UniProtKB/Swiss-Prot annotation:
Alphabetic keyword roster: Cell membrane, Membrane, Translocase, Transmembrane, Transmembrane helix
Gene Ontology CC terms: plasma membrane
PANTHER family attached to this UniProt entry: CYTOCHROME C OXIDASE SUBUNIT 3 (PTHR11403:SF7), CYTOCHROME C OXIDASE SUBUNIT III (PTHR11403)
The keyword Transmembrane helix belongs to this UniProt entry's keyword annotation: yes
Transmembrane segments: 21-41, 46-66, 89-109, 174-194, 212-232, 256-276
InterPro entries noted in UniProt: Cyt_c/ubiquinol_Oxase_su3, Cyt_c_oxase_su3_dom, Cyt_c_oxidase-like_su3, Cyt_c_oxidase_su3-like_sf, Cyt_c_oxidase_su3_a-hlx
Protein name stated in the entry: Probable cytochrome c oxidase subunit 3
Membrane topology reported for the UniProt record: Multi-pass membrane protein
GO molecular function: cytochrome-c oxidase activity
Species: Rickettsia prowazekii (strain Madrid E)
Gene from which this protein is expressed: ctaE
Length: 278
């Protein structure tokens, strides 16, 4: 980061990013996180240490990277109109890739439900199975899953209220609505953990269980990431970083987009995995 870069007159409106260690360090941190996750699934030695190191490394790298991006926008004023447009396109493309990512889980779950695999004379045979498998005791969709649906729908309302308050230059209401959204996100995560703790099937108990935990688990991870995103926005809003002039609240806008995306994915999960899957 060059603190004097703002004093240099540029002949264009684009931001030439300074050399940064965070992309490559984040890549290694994610690799460590994946290794830790796989080790935990197989019960390898030191798996929790590796997983914890991966989580801490990813959080630190992302914090440092986003801190630099915020500084480039607020301190160095590098986020000109073309730069903001590029950031918006990047966020839209990111959400589209996430849509494809979750579509794979839905496709796998639906394919397995249409053509369930069962064991016949010791051989895995298509269409000989029952869906859900008789060994799986599914969750009541109108118990904890329904409560979580209401929580996320309410959080979508509060984040929209925060955005509206920001547009109206009402900092107090914006901060309050963000706080409510964060609390709802944390409560959703705690309810999900409670559901997992009382589940009567494990990740390794067949195709239904693995599909269920992968789909809901990755969604839960996205809720945690979104909650962290909102916590950052909460402190930035309290500090007065966000303005309505020149679209000076991209960070908040992206957090709201991401949170609404998480809401929509959950509605599909609730419909296909919990209701139709039960």
């Amino acid at each position: 980061m060059n603190p004097n870069s703002n004093s240099i007159t540029k002949s264009h409106l684009f931001h030439i990013v300074n050399p940064s260690p965070w992309p490559i360090l984040t890549s290694f941190a994610l690799l460590l996180l994946v290794i830790g996750g796989i080790s935990s699934m197989h019960g390898y030695k030191f798996n929790m240490y590796i997983l914890s190191a991966g989580v801490i490394s990813v959080i630190y790298c992302l914090y440092s990277w986003w801190r630099d991006v915020v500084q480039e926008g607020i301190v160095e004023h590098q986020h000109t109109s073309p730069v903001r447009k590029g950031l918006k396109i990047g966020m839209v493309l990111f959400i589209l890739t996430e849509t494809v990512f979750f579509s794979v889980f839905f496709a796998s779950f639906l394919k397995s439900s249409i053509s369930p695999v069962g064991i016949l004379d010791g051989v895995w045979v298509v269409k000989q199975g029952i869906w859900p498998p008789p060994t799986i005791k599914t969750f009541d969709p109108f118990d904890i899953p329904f409560i979580n649906t209401l929580i996320l729908l309410l959080s979508g309302t509060t984040i929209t209220g925060a955005h509206y308050a920001l547009e109206e230059k009402n900092q107090k209401d914006c901060v309050t609505a963000l706080a409510f959204t964060i609390v709802l996100g944390i409560f959703f995560t705690l309810m999900q953990v409670y559901e997992y703790y009382h589940a009567e099937f494990k990740f390794t108990d067949g195709i239904y269980a693995s599909n269920f935990y992968l789909a809901t688990g990755f969604h839960g991870a996205h809720v945690v990431i979104g909650t962290i995103f909102l916590i950052v926005c909460y402190f930035r809003a309290k500090r007065g970083d966000f303005t309505t002039e020149g679209n000076g609240h991209l960070g908040f806008e992206f957090a709201a987009w991401y949170w609404h995306f998480v809401d929509v994915v959950w509605l599909f999960l609730f419909t296909f995995v919990y209701i139709l899957g039960s």
